[in-house]
Structure formats: structure tokens, C-alpha cells
Amino acid sequence: MKFQELDGVKTLRDFPNSGIKRGDIGTVLASFTKPNEAYEVEFCSETGETKALFAILSKDLEILKINRRFIHP
């Protein structure tokens, strides 16, 4: 698996149906291996409300290059 639960990730492309854009930051909540490697990612607003929650293929995500504890205290 490329990512772990609670990893901070950013999107590598737009997801127009959900309002998520390339570069938006989310949190991995779960991982899947079938039929393809994918991750359930939650995207939150600045006030902490969930904006979107859906599965994304691993090729469309990148790990954040900052300390995990900074994102998930």
C-alpha cells in the first residue's frame, strides 16, 4: 500500500463532480486493493466540516511532504 490511514495527501487532478481541485488536501481514512488500489479520502473545509468523502485511485494522490502529526494532532 502506498499510503496509510491518517496520511495527509493532495490530489493530482481535479474531481469536478465533487468540487475537489488539483492540489486540494485530504486525509486517508481507508484503503482498498480490489479492483484497484484506491483510498477513501476526506476533504474538510477550513472550519472542519466535511466537503467531500470518496475513493480515489492511488495514481491520483501524492503524500504531503510534512510531518503527519502537524496535520493530525
Which residue stretches match the model-derived regions?
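Basic/aromatic-rich interaction segments and small domains that mediate binding to polyanionic partners
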Residues: 3-67, 71-72
